[in-house]
Every structure is written in structure tokens, then in C-alpha cells.
Amino acid sequence: MTTNNITTLLDLIAEGNSSPKEFLQKIDPYQLSRIIYPRFHGTPDHVLCKGLPIQSGDVNGILVLGKDVANAIATNKLNKQNTPSYVYSTPGGDVSDFSAIQTCSAYFTSNPARTEFCAVQSVLEGKPTIIDIPVTYHEEDEDRIIELVTSTGITQEVKTKHRWISYTQPDGKTTTVTEGTPISVSGETGEIFLKQLQIDESPIDYIYETLTECYLEAARDEEDPYPWNSLQETRTFSRNRTKLQQAINSSTFIGFQKVLQHAISISAPSILCNVHRPACIAKAKLVSSVITFDNEGLKIASDKEKYGIGLLRDERMWVDQEDIDILRVLLLGPGTTSIENYQKFCSMYTQRHGNRYRKIFATGVGSTCVARTLCMPISKFLPDDFDIDGFAIKHGLDPLKSKAVFNRMTSEREIYHGCRGIRMFMIRPDLLKLWLMTVLRAYQASERVNGQTKITFLLATLTFPEEARRFIHTLEECLLDLWESIESSPVAGVATMLETGGAFISIEDILSAHGQDIEMIGGLVGVNDFTTACLNMNRNDAPKFMIPSYVESAMLKTSPFSSIETTVVG
């Protein structure tokens, strides 16, 4: 079904000449996504190569291969309209790539794993994302000046290294694309194009994105107790008022909302989203709401039971370089510096990280909030080639002691089963308490907004029942420091990820763990965990050869990255 046909069906629904039920019977999610996201006009040509799309949307941008170029674009003094749009690409990455991903228009990588570190971050940011692009990355030390031109013709010069990607076709012909080249990326087809293409805007995407921006602008006024009531007072709303009113009152959006509300009425789903910043939960709230715009202005009718935070991902919140350095100091520990200096970093963590949590909670968490322990391999914060000597000098640490701790902690070979999640907190109970108090204080400050909504803590990499018991014990201590009783606190309980063989073997004992009032209330299993714990395959290696080969030989009916193999997990 073409985009025009889908739009026509929505028009008929808006006019009352067709039903949402009939619409849902005629289309599939892939077809529906064609009207939800921006799409290239017509049939594009000039294809360089193709990978596997994992997040939809079609965009134009300048190819950026280095963090220095991305940071130069993000920190320029031009306004948003005059900031160059760029497509970011790396073969892999770590937490230092997060800022580049947050401000890019799309991301692609040669890595074939859906769980590749930067690809996951890109999907969480809502960026068109493609994995398994068959290109090779190149870099030379020679200096090069890149001229970045905006849509309004303003030029920004960036000094950087010489970088490019290359693609070799089946006939042996190789095409190279240098950093700074204008390209287009399709998150629908997975194709990279060697020219910038015309894009048809989606009114649905425009409405949700613009209203999210309105909320974020209103929320910057920390004196405003409920920013949702102030959307129409923002500059973003003022600039977009006429276009917003037309889009919201369009038959396409009216029909889409009727379809959405019909789906909600017959299945009563909750929109539970991955969250690492306020925009995530703000957009989830908007999607679950009924939005109208009449002579009295914009109206958003929300039901908190229809959306919530399914997974609050602490590890994905670390974007700012200064904040990342704070966490690095804490990971290296109090033995690397003076007590006074270490306490300074603890205070900075509490203030800055707590402020991030407070802004998320103040948005309104909806029906539920599941907060997960810091689930980040150490190698993504402290890679093997990290300049530990320079870092120690910069932040007032003892270089020799810092290097000794660094050498002991780093060089993890199996990073995803390394020292992260509950393992780090068991080794460093001081960090566990610091994290819990930071999250709980932020949630306490938002109790007026969230009412009776409960928070559940989710433990990553848990293997031993004792780990669950110790976490619960520390949690109860923190709760009694902040509330009169544990019963009066907003904590529903504790759950565990099932991502280690030990967790599967000991699941009954783990789920039996409890404290005075807090107990284990459930578990969560996902694709990554299935691959590593059930199949005992490295989750980065598995998609390249082993799993495709098992599917080809009919050992598995489908890839576990698209369905669960019940013969293994029951």
C-alpha cells in the first residue's frame, strides 16, 4: 500500500466514511511507519550501499566521521536554523560519542549487531539508524579544513584529520566518500545516497516533535510548577502556531488519532518507553494523549495510565563530557585522591546527576517507572587507550594510584558480562548508596506531579541471591532516611534482569529475596540476554556468522533478534 493510499484511508476515517478497525486490518506496522516519519519524495537514486535499518526516518546531512567535527557543529554560535545537519557514523564507540549522536540527524555503522553501543543510543534518541553498512573506515593524520554549509548558505569551517569511508561493489569498483560530503540516509530502506534528496514532511511527526520542543522550552523555567500548562506561552509554539493548528486539524492527523484511540480501546496498551532524558517521556505522554486545536487554543487530554517509563536507563544519561569525568573519578574511587577532593566529586554527582533525574520525573512518569542500575561496561567509560595520566593531573588525582586502579579495572575482554550493573554496586557499596539517594531524592521532589505512581528498581547482571538481598538492605536504609516509613515511600519493589546463566539457575532463590518490607517482584529477559545466557554466544559475534548459519541450517527457525526461541527459554 502506498503512502497516498494510507493517507486517503485516514482522510476517510476522519470524515466518518471508514472505520479504524478496517484500517488496521488493511495495513501492517511497516506501512503505517511511512506516514509517521519523514520520507524521501519519489523513488530516490544515487545509492551508495545498503544496510539494516533499525529506526525509521529519512534525512539529509553532511557526513561526519569524527567526534571533533560533531562537537564543533554542536558548539557553534549559530542559531538552530543555521546549524549544519549531519549524519554521524563510526565502526564502534563509547560514551564519548553520545553528545555527537544526540545532535546528529541520523547514525549508521558497519557493526552488524543491533545491540552495538552507539546504535542503541541512536535509537533511544529517535534518530534514523542503520547497522551492518558494508563500508570501511579510513583516517590519516594530515590536517584538513572542512567547509560545512547550512541550508541558509552560512559556511562553518572545521579543522580536523582526513577521514573517509569506502565501499567496494561486487564488480570490484570502489567508491570513497570523504567527511563533509552531503549525503542522504533512509531509516526505512537502510540505504545511503550520494546526494541530498527532497523530503516529504510527516504532519504526525511534526506535531509530536514540535510539542515536545514546546514542553522542553517551558520546563526550562524552574519556577513553573507544571510546564505542561505553559506550552502556548513558549517561543517555539508562537513560531509554529499556524502550522501546528493546520496539522492538528488535518484529516490525516484526525484519522490517525482515531486509529490510535481505537487501538487503545480494544487492547488497553500502555506506551512504556525507554527513557534517558525528559524528551523521551514527554513524547510518550503526547502519543498517548488526544490532541486538539480549536478557537480556544491547544488542548492535550492525557491519561497517566496510558504511558509510563518502562526502562529508565542511567547509563544512557551520560552525554556531557564534564559529567562523564565526574563519574570516571567516582569509578576510580576515593583511594586515588584526597578525601576533600573526592567528596567534591560526590557532591557534583549528586547535584548534576540528580538534576537530570529531577527533570525526567518532573515531566510526569505516567503509570509506572522502572529505574535500572548503571548498566555500562567499564570499557565504555574508561577504554584501554584512555589517557589516565592526563586525566589524573586534570582532576587532582594521584597519577600513580589512579593508574594502578585503572590497570586493574580495565582491559575487560567480555565487556557485556563485565563489571557493570549490580556487580559494580556490590564491589562499591558506597556508589550504590550514592546512586540510590540521588534517584530517590529526585523522585521525592516530583511526588506532587506523579502522585501515587510507584518506582521499581531493576538490577542488571545479577547472578547471586545475595546480591539481591544486599541491594534491598541498602535500599531500605535509604528509604528510611527520606520517608517516615518504607510503606509511605514510592517504591513498589525490586526486579532483576535475567542475563546470566547463574540468574536462570538461581531464579527461585533470587525472587525469594526480601528485606523488612521490600521484596523481589519480577524479572526481565531480552534478546541480548537470550543470546549470551541461553545460547552462550557473544552478542557481538553472534549476528555476524553463528546465528545466521543456524537459521540457514534450520537449527533455529528465525533469528532470536526477531523472536524468542521457546525451545531454549520455555
Question: Model regions: which residues?
Answer:
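Conserved alpha/beta-domain cores
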Residues: 223, 240-570
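Predominant activation on well-ordered alpha-helical scaffold segments within soluble catalytic domains
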Residues: 6-10, 21, 105, 116-123, ...
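Short, well-ordered loop/turn and helix-capping segments at boundaries between secondary-structure elements
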Residues: 15, 29, 124, 332, ...
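Conserved catalytic alpha/beta cores of large enzymes that bind or transform nucleotide phosphates
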Residues: 1-29, 37, 185, 218, ...
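Acidic, glycine-rich flexible loop/linker segments
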Residues: 37, 54-85, 90-312, 318-330
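Cysteine-dependent phosphatase catalytic core of the protein tyrosine phosphatase
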Residues: 1-75, 174, 191, 529
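Residues at alpha-helix termini
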Residues: 14-15, 124, 303, 481
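Catalytic P-loop NTP-binding/switch module of NTPases
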Residues: 3, 180, 416-417
